[in-house]
């Protein structure tokens, strides 16, 4: 799949990583509570790209826990396999950040039943103010359905999640992208 959007594809302020492709996916259908859903997962061949790995023993997080030393020599690309046990928490997640203070916030909000990826502080995002808006109806809906909407690029996107005691996230980070797969 293409990792861009026609609204801002021609104004993204980069050349090298402009209009990249996302990881290849395997699509499948599953039934839950009588409804049919589509699932997407990275193709099995993605595992062959892995090199070195590091494992962190399970730990409990109160307010914050920093693991930046684990990612100190990643050369801008890495995968995080993360298992979250909700316990009594209603919101849990992580923040990916760089030395410039730019960050992407990834979290699960159980009250809202949403997995959120917020890229409003992910770097140069102000070009989104010049993006071509959606049709009026869709644009208003996008503003209402987004989280922290700034413009059609700088916003938080989300996917629905069911309440569960544990979640497994597979997060792929590259120099210019973040892709998340849940359970």
Annotate each language-model stretch with its function.
Residues 1-182:
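Beta-rich accessory regions
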């Amino acid at each position: 799949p293409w990792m861009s959007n026609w609204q801002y594809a021609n104004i993204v302020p980069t050349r090298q990583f402009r209009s990249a492709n996302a990881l290849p996916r395997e699509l499948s259908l599953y039934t839950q509570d009588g409804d049919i859903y589509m699932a997407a997962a990275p193709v099995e061949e993605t595992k062959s790209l892995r090199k070195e790995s590091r494992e962190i023993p399970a730990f409990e997080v109160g307010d914050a826990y920093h693991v930046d030393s684990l990612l100190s020599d990643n050369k801008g690309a890495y995968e995080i396999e993360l298992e979250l046990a909700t316990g009594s928490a209603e919101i849990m997640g992580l923040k990916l950040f760089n030395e410039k203070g730019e960050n992407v916030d990834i979290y699960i909000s159980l009250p809202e039943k949403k997995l959120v990826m917020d890229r409003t502080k992910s770097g140069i995002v102000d070009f989104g103010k010049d993006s071509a808006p959606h049709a009026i109806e869709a644009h208003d809906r996008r503003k209402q359905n987004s989280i922290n909407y700034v413009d059609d690029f700088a916003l938080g996107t989300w996917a629905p999640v069911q309440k569960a005691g544990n979640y497994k996230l597979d997060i792929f980070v590259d120099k210019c992208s973040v892709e998340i797969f849940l359970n």
